[in-house]
């Protein structure tokens, strides 16, 4: 098996947990969506590393043009994305309503940009915003550390322009969660997932 496609095979087969150090590297961007009552959900964008990108193109870019057609995207969704429902798409959302881990997502697509494959999908998450501030914490991580998931350096969270709602966010480590792993040289290590702490309010 060619090295470039190993990550794709693991994604499709669901073999996380057998390895103690990352095999897939990805950055996340989160875009909040409002409706008339408050928060409607989040668009999630993942940007993958070059090795994973090469595997996706090798296995699923049938015409080898480094662009993904609708039919190719459908196969990617089926064979290299749908299994992630078993990991709740690596998403942990906390608010006063409790913890939410999505069991389904909507509007999946995949595309190439800057030489990297990107996944994009929508996570419905309805939360009313009234007179009091609403706080939502969003974390994206793989507790097995097969995937090393970070955030975009530029604009990791996007808030839509709105005359009704406003908000701000900060990114911080969640010291309550400890992920142990084994480095490539065999030495032990540990890390803490980073979460986006989002505060939303109604302006009128």
Question: What is each PLM-predicted segment?
Answer:
Residues 4-13:
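Sec-dependent N-terminal signal peptides
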Residues 51-127:
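Structured domain cores in non-transmembrane regions
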């Amino acid at each position: 098996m060619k090295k470039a496609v190993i990550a794709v095979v693991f994604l499709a087969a669901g073999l996380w947990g057998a390895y103690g150090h990352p095999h897939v590297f990805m950055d996340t961007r989160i875009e909040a969506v409002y409706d008339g009552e408050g928060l409607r959900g989040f668009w999630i964008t993942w940007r993958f590393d070059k090795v994973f990108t090469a595997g996706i193109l090798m296995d699923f870019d049938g015409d080898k043009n480094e662009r993904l057609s609708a039919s190719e995207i459908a196969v990617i969704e089926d064979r290299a994305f749908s299994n992630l429902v078993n990991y709740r798409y690596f998403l942990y959302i906390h608010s006063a309503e409790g913890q939410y881990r999505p069991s389904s997502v909507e509007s999946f697509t995949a595309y190439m940009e800057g030489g990297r494959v990107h996944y994009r999908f929508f996570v419905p998450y309805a939360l009313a915003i009234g007179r009091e501030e609403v706080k939502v914490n969003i974390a994206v991580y793989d507790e097995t550390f097969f995937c090393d998931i970070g955030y975009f350096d530029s604009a990791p969270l996007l808030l839509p322009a709105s005359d009704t709602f406003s908000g701000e966010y900060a990114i911080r480590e969640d010291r309550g969660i400890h992920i142990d792993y084994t480095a490539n040289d065999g030495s032990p290590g540990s890390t803490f997932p980073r979460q986006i702490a989002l505060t939303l309010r109604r302006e009128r």
